[in-house]
């Protein structure tokens, strides 16, 4: 059964401050944002369609929003990563809690690093770890 209250709470973790953290870090300009879109067989909470400032090359950034289950969020990010140039998990935890999770769970750390997943604390509105750029080709069929 769908917990609509939880979905509404998670959507509140995404705002202009979070968006600007991502855009400024990567030097992108926003073209559009999409909420709760299906890509492949999976739903993505937020998709940012951006372009580079110099050459205006389009890029796609996927974002998974979670209240506090970082393991589930990273697992979902991995399942969706192949469709996006960057992928972020935005989670409502303090930075210290996020860092503890990463250091206490070596598999979680390896997954985050291996897939280039970025982490943002919605609680503190700060980037913990930036997402790495990946060349992707599958997204074009869905977004561009």
What are these regions (language model features)?
Residues 44-49, 84, 131-132:
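Residue-level detection of beta-strand scaffold positions
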Residues 46-50, 58-67:
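Conserved catalytic cores of phosphodiester-cleaving nucleases, focusing on short active-site segments
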Residues 34-39, 61-71:
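Phosphate-binding glycine-rich loops and adjacent basic patches that engage nucleotide phosphates
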Residues 1-43, 49-55:
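Acidic-basic catalytic patches of nuclease active cores, encompassing PD-(D/E)XK
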Residues 41-43, 56-60, 82-84, 114:
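Short connector loops at helix/strand junctions that flank enzyme active sites
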Residues 66-120:
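Catalytic cores of nucleic-acid endonucleases
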Residues 1, 20, 52, 109-144:
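Non-catalytic C-terminal interaction segments of nucleic acid-processing enzymes
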């Amino acid at each position: 059964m769908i917990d609509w209250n939880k979905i509404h709470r998670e959507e509140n973790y995404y705002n202009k401050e979070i968006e600007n953290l991502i855009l400024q870090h990567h030097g992108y300009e926003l073209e559009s944002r999409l909420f709760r879109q299906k890509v492949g067989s999976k739903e993505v909470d937020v998709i940012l369609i951006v372009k580079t400032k110099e050459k205006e090359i389009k890029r796609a950034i996927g974002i998974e929003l979670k209240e506090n289950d970082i393991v589930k969020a990273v697992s979902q990010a991995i399942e969706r990563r192949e469709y996006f140039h960057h992928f972020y998990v935005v989670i409502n935890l303090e930075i210290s809690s996020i860092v503890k999770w990463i250091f206490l769970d070596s598999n979680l750390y390896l997954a985050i690093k291996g897939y280039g997943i970025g982490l943002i604390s919605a609680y503190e509105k700060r980037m913990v770890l930036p997402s790495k750029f990946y060349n992707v080709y599958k997204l074009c069929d869905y977004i561009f």
